[in-house]
């Protein structure tokens, strides 16, 4: 009985803490989801994996030297479909513009076109999961699609009050809209 009461108190506290930020986060998420339409990629086989089959918003990278993980797919067995392994290179853009990037197998240049595969809004950050629209040339002459997770950190109050111009301005410094579907 004691454990049940503790569980109820814990769940109630968690819900109470999230009520204030839940509405604003969903507002930010809704506005950004409307602005950054999600794309879908196809991974039927190893030779054609990463082809964009449903194009959403196309973004243009505004900076040079951004890391990207090489697209990886897996298959449980020979009869199951292939699926995308969510192995993104993470680039974190802090509140003051400080950048932290993980090393990765690909480097993307200014002007690289990207599509959005997913968008998440947390209490203190916006995460945009991207995929290169065209394959990127590797040093050995092969080409592969790249995957990068952009994490834009914000003061929780900025997202709680749904300050869309501030959020959009920070994202636009890195990712501009090339075309929207």
Across the structure, where does each feature detected by a protein language model lie?
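A sequence-level detector of short, solvent-exposed, charge-rich linear segments
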Residues: 16, 78, 135-138
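N-terminal secretory signal peptides that target proteins for export/translocation
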Residues: 1-2
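Bacterial N-terminal signal peptides
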Residues: 5-16
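A broad, structure-centric signal for solvent-exposed, well-ordered loop/edge residues
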Residues: 8, 68, 123-126
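N-terminal secretory signal peptides
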Residues: 20-108, 115-118
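Mature extracytoplasmic/lumenal regions of exported proteins
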Residues: 100-181
